[in-house]
């Protein structure tokens, strides 16, 4: 099996012995140049130009948690093409990041940092902080990251609701790095809403956590009307994709006090422009798309790819295989 690896990290991966690996750069041009007529598997984050031929290609593995770069792409839509992604690899760090931002908000860590800078010692009751326990969090997108977030929050006494395509409590069939992570049977949410009932779910949520893929249907999922449906002073945490939020509508909702705060780790476009109003807004906390960055990312990528190569050669379903209908947009 001939595999083209477009990856800037280590390439000393222990893959099945009959897999012949060629490496190339991560740019679309480098990928197009690296694809040979007999390349069967492309492991990448970006995709080559739409007019790329690659006649032997039969499987694209995306090294990202999402798959928006493959939606509508001719190679991904080719008959018989299999597409998978790296969803779940970063579930642990991303879930911890979400919980960290929630604690940061409720426990007023930023306020305490400002007090330290000003060498101010206030009265204890003046800075009393409420518990996280008993708050309600709405997880929008109940995949690997969403389920691991639910597991951590439930252990802390947070009431979790979830948004997914259907209201069935579905078993998770994707990849997770360690046993016991996530919510395998989908039993943790107190309530599950379909996307069509987003407004209803938003009305009672203290925290709205975005972990859903960006698709044409979910672009600007949080917009003027949906932001207006949120519980007053609720907090948004976005670790998925920047395009899920209409930034102009978000600023308006923050300015009016409808939304209490937004913790944004993702933006559209990236990097965030230096003149973006998001940087300086007092009710927005910006982090540079770091929630899923971890030192052992290459090890996790290798482990998932190795398992899927074995599955592919055995004719079995791939972990994190994306249904063709989702790639049509």
Spans of features found by a protein language model:
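Rossmann-like dinucleotide-binding domain for NAD(H)/NADP(H)
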Residues: 233, 239-329
